[in-house]
Amino acid sequence: MIKEYIRKITEGKDLSADEMKDLFNILMEGQATDAQIGAVLIGLKMKGESVEEISSAAQIMREKAVKVPVKDRSRLIDTCGTGGDKVDTFNVSTITAFVIAGAGVKVAKHGNRSVSSKCGSADIMEALGVKIDLSPEQAAEAIDRIGLGFLFAPVYHPAMKNVIRQRREIGVRTIFNILGPLSNPAGAKYQLLGVYDKDLVEPVARVLSLLGIERAYVVHGMEGLDEVSITTDTMVAEVDGGDISVYSVKPEDFGIERASLDDIRGGDLDFNLQIALDILEGKDRSRKTDFVSLNAGFAFHAVGVVDSVKEGIELAKETIYSKKAYEILEKLREYSKGG
């Protein structure tokens, strides 16, 4: 059957929901050859994944995921993005997770090691001294007690082992970059989700709505960022239950002066680690902290703890400079030692 799906995809035809679910069951259960996996991933990429295809694949990912037994999901958010931006920024969404948690919002930070960037969220978490491969029960306890738990994708998506090597060998972004943020194992109902392509903003928002998200922002910085940008305009899709509104924002809308790309560039793991520590310790007074605060502002507004993004930015800066974000890191490090 997989050959029939490959033929259809390579002819530029969309798969139905049932076909896509069947195809992803085949991939996730290790029933496809390397050549077939490569053909499916590149074929879908060349064709362009439909909303129905993405949501069907995400449903299979969610079904097969190991669940995280968080006690209170009422205001649980994830800041996992697709990765693969074109600018090589530092780990904005990971630092943002600490800031959000520092203000008392519970975060289930889903992430992985780098696949298409220099330094993934799992890489930076590990460098910060956080144990990344906690059991589902330990991660749930970290979320409930500390306010932040890291959900290392391979622990929660064991079926992904059947495609991870092929993804790395292909070396380009595929549907799996999109599916990761759509498959939070803790069932977070709020999201700040950055995507690497402006053409994904509205489709991913529609997928989130289909998957039952309560409120989310799907964002793409127009210079190629999977974050809210402080250097140029950002395309935004705001998801509020079944309602979706798409619009553009610029840094000046929030009282933030535009930065240059050099102001927000990251580097290798050591370089990004130092940036993360400087921001979390409240030592950084550069545009990097503005960048994190802007993204945290959107996250705070998504979850409903502030009335506006601008108010969220102020809350983010207050959380950073009062060392509350760093306190979350210290608690997570301590918890990691006992975990």
UniProtKB/Swiss-Prot annotation:
Disulfide bonds: none annotated. Keywords: Amino-acid biosynthesis, Aromatic amino acid biosynthesis, Glycosyltransferase, Magnesium, Metal-binding, Transferase, Tryptophan biosynthesis. Its cofactor is Mg(2+). Mg(2+) 2 binds at D226, E227. Binds 2 magnesium ions per monomer. PANTHER family: ANTHRANILATE PHOSPHORIBOSYLTRANSFERASE. One of its GO terms (molecular function) is magnesium ion binding. Mg(2+) 1 binds at S93, E227. Belongs to the anthranilate phosphoribosyltransferase family. It holds the Pfam family Glycos_transf_3. Anthranilate 2 binds at R167. Anthranilate 1 binds at G81, N112. InterPro entries: Anthranilate_Pribosyl_Tfrase, Glycosyl_Trfase_fam3, Glycosyl_Trfase_fam3_N_dom, Glycosyl_Trfase_fam3_N_dom_sf, Nuc_phospho_transferase. This is Anthranilate phosphoribosyltransferase. 5-phospho-alpha-D-ribose 1-diphosphate binds at residues 81, 84-85, 89, 91-94, 109-117, 121. It comes from Persephonella marina (strain DSM 14350 / EX-H1).
